[in-house]
Amino acid sequence: MTLEMVAARAGVGRQTVSNAINSPELLRPQTLERVRHAIDELGYRPHRAAQALKTRASRLIGYGIRSSSTRVPTPVLDQFLHSLSEAADRAGYRVVLFAVAPGDDELTSYQQLLDEHGADGFVLSGTDRGDRRQGWLHERGVPFVAFGRTWSGKDVGDWVDVDGAAGTSAAVRHLAGLGHRRIGFLGWPKGSGVGDDRARGWQSAMRELGLPTRGRRVASPDDPEQATEAAEKLLATGVTAVVAASDTLALGWYQALRRAGRGPGPEAAVIGFDDSPIAPLLFPSLSSLAQPLDAVGRACMRLLLDRLRDRDRPTEHILLEPELVLRESV
């Protein structure tokens, strides 16, 4: 049941039905009575979202937590959410975390937060190919911003992302500047937006520098043991340096070298991605690409606030570059 159906039954416009629910004092008594009769006749139950999204009375921003997120490590999410929550608090909003049902029920979780709490908007993360959330929210006129690009389909909605390709390209160029010519890439299986983006940066930099790529890209899930097996394949090709799509994958290079009686360093360099809390604690300490998560959180909140103020403004996309943090592993 929708506002449009009530409007058709009452013979009025959609805005008139919205006014009857949110601001009845704006309507003539006869019109208000006609709309209320249609509501009763159809059994329409106004969602709190119909009121909250109009008045922003709830001042709540929803953030759905998926049961598993293999592409967004927990330390990354923790720092991002801290920055996002601080920015929301300064603007007078609260970020509400809610569990997202897996599979086909995922969107139901978003609908429930709209129905039960009237969230003003949503912040998404962990976007990937086939992600239905952006299109679903866009079709319903619900304000949202994503930490992550729209990797497939129509590019809808505002987003902030980190330029993974720029990061891995910078890593390759740094390693090449140290004299490495056989530089491998330890990434995730093909098909992930974030993973393919990071692989693309490695490949483009290698080609621009005239360095061979054939046989020097291996894939593994974000699991240390499987990453070790993949890293051993790279080691067998004679590479002298590796760029990894995550710090977890970089751990596989550490372990593969240790099994071979060696260790990371100038002769077997590695650069990870995410600059997780474990990176400086490893021995030798891990060089890594740090995402500007504080800036991402602030930018996400700014875009969402702008969208709440003006639903019709052009979409805005912000792409930030990671920082190469050098340590002992190179």
Task: Give the location of each predicted region.
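Residues at secondary-structure transition points
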Residues: 1, 26, 30, 48, ...
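N-terminal helix-turn-helix DNA-binding module of bacterial transcription factors
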Residues: 1-60
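Short acidic/polar active-site loop segments enriched in Thr and Asp
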Residues: 13, 59, 120, 181-183, ...
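Short beta-strand segments enriched in small/hydrophobic residues
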Residues: 16, 56-70, 174, 182-188
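Bacterial carbohydrate/catabolite-sensing allosteric modules
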Residues: 41, 86-91, 138-146, 151-330
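Amphipathic helical "hinge" segments at domain boundaries
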Residues: 44-109, 203
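Short beta->alpha connector loops
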Residues: 101-104, 125-130, 248
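Active-site-adjacent beta->alpha loops and helix N-cap segments on the catalytic face
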Residues: 131-138
